[in-house]
């Protein structure tokens, strides 16, 4: 099965459906999870953890880190996946540390090239750390009109980076 395809169990019907990672991330987001949970949840199994643990790990990162409007949760979710995939397991493993940072930098560059920005409040055009900003986001239906694009973009970029890494690893 290609890396881009995942089997996902629809919670309400219990039936098996096949979708790519960006679609899976968007589906998780539409189920009510935050943007970070959606991205890491879609890639959890590929990164060596179960989806429930991934979603719990990312629970505080929505809305730009606990709704502070800082780094977009779709971005931090991808960064967590990169860390799980490449991160060091020994403090002295500087090679894996550098590989992780290299992959994060590449991800950030690609996300910024698509969207211009990395901060939630700038991407949305409102400050979700304030009641007024949250109301603006609600009134504008940003959860359905803006955020899904960032979740999909993040998942597409992450999928591409992980696939490129798999190809390089298989050539060595």
Regions found by a protein language model. Give the residues of each.
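Short, Lys/Arg-enriched N-terminal segments with co-localized hydrophobic residues
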Residues: 2-18
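Polybasic, low-complexity association/targeting segments
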Residues: 18-31
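Short cysteine clusters
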Residues: 35, 72, 120
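Acidic-glycine-rich active-site phosphate/pyrophosphate-binding loop
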Residues: 42-60, 126-131
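Phosphate-handling active-site elements
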Residues: 47-56, 84-103, 166
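Glycine/serine-rich anion-binding loops at beta->alpha junctions
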Residues: 61-80
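C-terminal binding/interaction regions
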Residues: 101-172
């Amino acid at each position: 099965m290609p890396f881009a395809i995942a089997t996902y169990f629809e919670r309400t019907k219990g039936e098996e459906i096949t979708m790519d990672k960006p679609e899976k991330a968007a589906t998780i987001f539409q189920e009510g999870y935050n943007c970070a949970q959606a991205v890491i949840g879609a890639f959890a199994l590929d990164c060596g953890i179960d989806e429930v643990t991934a979603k719990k790990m990312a629970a505080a990162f929505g809305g730009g880190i606990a709704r502070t409007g800082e780094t977009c949760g779709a971005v931090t979710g991808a960064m967590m996946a990169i860390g799980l995939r490449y991160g060091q397991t020994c403090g002295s493993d500087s090679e894996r540390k550098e590989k992780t940072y290299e992959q994060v930098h590449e991800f950030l560059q690609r996300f910024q090239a698509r969207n211009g920005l990395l901060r939630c409040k700038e991407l949305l055009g409102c400050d979700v750390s304030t009641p007024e900003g949250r109301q603006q986001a609600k009134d504008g239906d940003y959860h359905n009109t803006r955020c899904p694009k960032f979740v999909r973009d993040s998942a597409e970029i992450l999928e591409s980076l992980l696939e490129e890494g798999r190809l390089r690893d298989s050539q060595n």
